[in-house]
Swiss-Prot record:
Entry's Gene Ontology BP terms: neuropeptide signaling pathway
Assigned keywords, A-Z: Neuropeptide, Secreted
UniProt protein name: Tachykinin-related peptide 10
Compartmental location: Secreted
Tissue-specific expression: Brain.
Predominant subcellular localization, coarse grouping: secreted
GO cellular component terms listed in the entry, alphabetical order: extracellular region
Native source species: Rhyparobia maderae
Length: 15
């Protein structure tokens, strides 16, 4: 996900 969460916006945003 892109902006799923604060953490997701960092490394998870790449996926």
């Amino acid at each position: 996900s892109g902006l799923d969460s604060l953490s997701g916006a960092t490394f998870g945003g790449n996926r």
